[in-house]
Design a protein with these regions (language model features):
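Membrane-embedded alpha-helical bundles of multi-pass enzymes
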Residues: 2-206, 404-405, 416-420, 431-439, ...
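Soluble catalytic domains of enzymes that build or remodel membrane lipids, polysaccharides, and related
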Residues: 203-473, 477
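Short, Lys/Arg-enriched, Gly/Pro-containing loop segments at transmembrane-helix junctions
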Residues: 495-503
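Cytoplasmic C-terminal tails of single-pass
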Residues: 501, 507-516
Length: 516
C-alpha cells in the first residue's frame, strides 16, 4: 500500500515542478529555457493515469502550479483596482487560478482518453487548441515566454504565438515519449531550427522595409503619478503640469506626444473641446494623445467611457476612441445589470460602457494611430481589427499604478510586443508608472523608461501599412489544431499512432475472464 502512495506523490511532485517551470518563465524572462519542458510531466503521466479522475487531478496539479505563482499579482489588482477587501480578493484569485487550471485538466482528459499509443502530434495539437479556445482572463500562451529569442518570435506574422507553442509542446512530448529515439526528436528539433533560420531571414527583410518607410517621432511621457495623487481632484493641475514639464524637455519637439490612460479622471464630454488645462499645453504645434474618463448622453442618462483623445496642433479635439474590452471587477462588475446588489461588494469599481468599435486617430494623412487602452494590447484579434481600420502605428496608453512593481508589468509587455510582430507595426506604450516603451516591428524593445520614475523619451518610429499573413488569415493555424484534436480524439483508436512497431494500448474497462 505504501509504494503506490509514494509513487503517486512523486508523480504529483513532478507535475507541480513542470507547472512551476512554466510559471518561472513568466516571472523571470531569463528563465525561458524552463518553459520548453514544462509540459513534459503532464504529457508523460496523463495518458497513463489509472482513471480519468487521476488524469484530471494530474492536470489540476500542473495547472495550479503554473497559475498560482505566475499571476499572483492579480490579488493586488483585484484588491486595489476593484476595491475589494483582501480576503475577498484572495477568494476571487483562488477561483480564477482554479479556473485557469481547468485548461490543463482538459488537456489531461484528452490525453488520457487517447492513451499512451496516441500520435506524437496529438498532445501538442491538444495543448495549442486549448490555448486558443480556453477563456483565460490573462491570455498567456506558452510561446509568449520566449520573448528573448527574437528569430522565433517572427512566426507571429504567420499565425501569432500558436506555432511556437505547438513546437515547444511537440518537443516536450517527444522527450517523454522516447527520449533516446533520435527519429522522434529529429522532427520537432528540425522544425524549431527551420523557424529559427526563417525568422533570422525575416528580421533582415523587415528591417530593410522599415528603413524605407516614412519616419515619425513619438514622445512617450511617464508621469509616475500614484493612485492617491491621480484620484485627488486638488492635485489635478499639479499632475498635468508634471506632464507638461516632461513634454517640454523633449527636444526637438516630436511629431506626436502620448500621455497615459486616464490622465483626466473627471468626465470629458465627447463633443467638447479639451479641458482648459490641456488646451493651455505649451508647444501647441505638437499633437497629443491622452487618456480621459469621458461621457455622453444616451436616452437622457450619462454613459461613461474609458477614452483616448487626440488633441490637434490647434488645441482642439480631432478624434476619440472608447475602450471596447473592459476589465471585469475593475471597469465593470459582471452581471451587475442583472443583480445590482453586486455593486455593493466593490463601490470603487467603475461602471464603464464598451465603445462601439476599433478606431484610428488621424494625426496626418500618413500617421494614423491605432489607440489601445491597457488590456487591449494583449488581444490579437482586437489589434488586427485596429490595423484593418487603417492604423500605421499602434499606441497603448495604460494606467499600471494598480500593479505596483510586480511581475504583471513585465508579463504585460511580454505579451504585448507580439502585436508589433503580428502586424509589422511599431508599438509605443505610454504607462503611468512602469515600463513605458517602444517596440519595433520585429519585436525589439527600441526604447524604455525606468520603473516608478517620471521621465519622457522620444521614440524614432516608422509608419508602415503592409499586411501580414496573420492579419489576412487570422487564427487559421489555431483552428487547424482544434480540428486536428477533434478528429484524433473522436475515439481512442483515432488518436493512436500508425507508426510501425507501435504496441497497442492497454484495454480499459472490465477485464475478460480467462479459463481456468
Amino acid at each position: 500500500m505504501r509504494r503506490p502512495v509514494i509513487r503517486r506523490l512523486a508523480r504529483r511532485l513532478l507535475l507541480a515542478l513542470g507547472g512551476a517551470a512554466i510559471a518561472s518563465a513568466f516571472l523571470r524572462p531569463a528563465a525561458w529555457p524552463l518553459a520548453w519542458l514544462g509540459l513534459a510531466p503532464l504529457f508523460a503521466f496523463a495518458p497513463r493515469a489509472a482513471t480519468r479522475r487521476d488524469a484530471i487531478v494530474d492536470g489540476l496539479v500542473a495547472g495550479l502550479a503554473t497559475n498560482v505563482p505566475a499571476f499572483f499579482w492579480l490579488v493586488q489588482t483585484i484588491h486595489r483596482f476593484g476595491g475589494f477587501p483582501l480576503p475577498v480578493a484572495l477568494f476571487f484569485y483562488a477561483v480564477l487560478a482554479t479556473f485557469g487550471a481547468l485548461q490543463f485538466a482538459l488537456v489531461a482528459t484528452l490525453l488520457h482518453r487517447a492513451g499512451p499509443p496516441a500520435s506524437i502530434l496529438f498532445a501538442p495539437a491538444a495543448w495549442t487548441a486549448s490555448e486558443f479556445l480556453f477563456p483565460n482572463l490573462f491570455p498567456w500562451r506558452l510561446g509568449h515566454s520566449q520573448r528573448d529569442l527574437l528569430p522565433l518570435l517572427q512566426v507571429g506574422e504567420l499565425a501569432g504565438p500558436y506555432p511556437l507553442s505547438f513546437a515547444m509542446a511537440w518537443l516536450a512530448n517527444a522527450v517523454v515519449r522516447r527520449p533516446l529515439d533520435v527519429r522522434r526528436l529529429a522532427a520537432p528539433v528540425l522544425t524549431i531550427a527551420v523557424l529559427w533560420c526563417w525568422g533570422t531571414w525575416r528580421i533582415d527583410r523587415v528591417d530593410r522595409e522599415v528603413e524605407q518607410a516614412p519616419p515619425f517621432t513619438v514622445g512617450i511621457v511617464q508621469g509616475n503619478v500614484g493612485l492617491g495623487e491621480k484620484r485627488h481632484a486638488a492635485r489635478f493641475e499639479d499632475n498635468v503640469e508634471r506632464y507638461r514639464r516632461l513634454s517640454r524637455d523633449l527636444a526637438p519637439p516630436p511629431d506626436l506626444l502620448v500621455w497615459p490612460e486616464t490622465v483626466v479622471e473627471w468626465g470629458v464630454p465627447h463633443d467638447s473641446d479639451p479641458p482648459s488645462e490641456l488646451d493651455a499645453f505649451p508647444g501647441a504645434p505638437t499633437p497629443l494623445v491622452f487618456g480621459a474618463v469621458s461621457w455622453s448622453r444616451r436616452k437622457g442618462d450619462p454613459v461613461w467611457y474609458n477614452s483616448a483623445f487626440l488633441r490637434g496642433a490647434d488645441g482642439r479635439l480631432r478624434g476619440a476612441y472608447d475602450k471596447i474590452v473592459l476589465m471585469p471587477f475593475g471597469e465593470f462588475i459582471p452581471f451587475a445589470s442583472t443583480w445590482p446588489w453586486l455593486k455593493t461588494l466593490s463601490p470603487a469599481t467603475g461602471d464603464f460602457t464598451p465603445g462601439a468599435g476599433p478606431a484610428v486617430l488621424d494625426v496626418s494623412p500618413r500617421a494614423k494611430v491605432g489607440p489601445l487602452i491597457c488590456y487591449e494590447d494583449l488581444l490579437s484579434g482586437h489589434v488586427r481589427a485596429t490595423v484593418d481600420a487603417g492604423a500605421t502605428l499602434l499606441a497603448t496608453i495604460a494606467n499600471d499604478a494598480w500593479f505596483g512593481d510586480t511581475a504583471a508589468l513585465h508579463q504585460h509587455e511580454m505579451l504585448a510586443l507580439w502585436r508589433a510582430v503580428e502586424n509589422r507595426r511599431f508599438l509605443v506604450r505610454a504607462t503611468n508608472i512602469c515600463l513605458s516603451s517602444g517596440v519595433d516591428p520585429v519585436g525589439r524593445r527600441v526604447a524604455n523608461l525606468p520603473v516608478e520614475k517620471e521621465a519622457a523619451i522620444a521614440v524614432q518610429t516608422r509608419l508602415l501599412d503592409g499586411a501580414t499573413p496573420y492579419r489576412r488569415l487570422g487564427d487559421l493555424f489555431a483552428w487547424t489544431t482544434v480540428l486536428a484534436t477533434a478528429w484524433l480524439a473522436r475515439s481512442p483508436r483515432g488518436a493512436r499512432s500508425d507508426a510501425p512497431g507501435t504496441p497497442p494500448g492497454p484495454r480499459r474497462g472490465r477485464p475478460r475472464r480467462g479459463r481456468a
